[in-house]
Amino acid sequence: MNDELFFDAGGPVLLVGGYGTVGTELARMAAPSWPLVLTGRTVQRGQRLAEETGAELRTWDLADPAPFRAEISAVVTVVNDPDDRVLRAAISGGVPFVDVTRWTTRLQRAATVAALAGPTSPVMLSSAWMGGVTSLVAAHLGDRLGGADTVDVAIRWDLADRAGSDSVEFMDRLGLDYEVMRDGQRHTVMPLSDAGRVRIGETLTRVARIDTPEQFTLPLTLCAQTATTRIGFSSSASTAALLAAKRLGFFRWGRGECFTGARRGLLYAPGEGGTAQLRIDVTRGSDTLSATVTDPAGQAHLTALGALLGLCRVRGEDGAPAPSGVVFPEQLPHPQNVPSELAAQGVDLVVRRAVRHEHAEGRAA
């Protein structure tokens, strides 16, 4: 590919996929601070958003080999970039880069691509759940405790929420075992295993394992000896159906492209809006802090907020100089600021000290 991105400190911020479900939320958050360029496959879809935000619209179809060129101050990828086109162009042009779309194996590949290229500008791989918000909260809790031995994440997916088609891409990975850190050792686990019930906010939710990038990065960045992420759904029937499909082996024998629609159709039925909610438990020694994150504006809004905070970080506009090279969201200079940064966008963070030896209704594990 011959894409060219050039760094211009006074230039606009480029949002690749900028008028999709998450991109729309991010554009609205970012527009008061920076001029924007929004790209996608069909610019007509972004016309109303461009008028609302004052953004420029351009076509950049990542599946089309036609080259793209722009002079920008930073770029955020909020759409799948399977061939690393945006990443490579940003590194080549010295442009600060944020990505919130990659699942674990693609994040690992991106980190390798970036490391080999030797970037001089920041490369923020912020694909932990909800655009890195889980990792930000884990870092905040770890900072309060003086470290993080274990990190347990429990997600409650609201089936009434708005969602783009990429949001259920994790369904394609439910037939693939993955590696986690447990008690300081690497273990291979099955998706949807270790099911249990966890109280997330006021709701007892059945959750099971899912492959997410923070389970790879948190042991590296926070030195967590155990990192676990599980997911459950607002409909107990949907959770039960998913677990039943797993027991029948559907996600093993139905891994091919011809089954993509069937896999994603188990959950992809976007509604008019719901609440994004997750719980993060961090333990250091005998102390555990439990945080519940609630965003009444939904998961697209919460993911966009993670992208916005990543953008501020790579631009050095969060009270500290911009980093260089590959970084993850939890590597932030001021973790104590996370609650106020979330609250500024209407996201509620409640932290409490957990009672030792809590059962399933307590800790996310």
Kindly give the residue locations of the regions a language model identified:
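Conserved Rossmann-fold cofactor-binding substructure of NAD(P)-dependent oxidoreductases
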Residues: 59-73, 77, 81-82
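N-terminal Rossmann-fold cofactor-binding loop
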Residues: 39-43, 61-62
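N-terminal Rossmann NAD(P)H-binding glycine-rich loop of SDR-like oxidoreductase domains
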Residues: 13-30
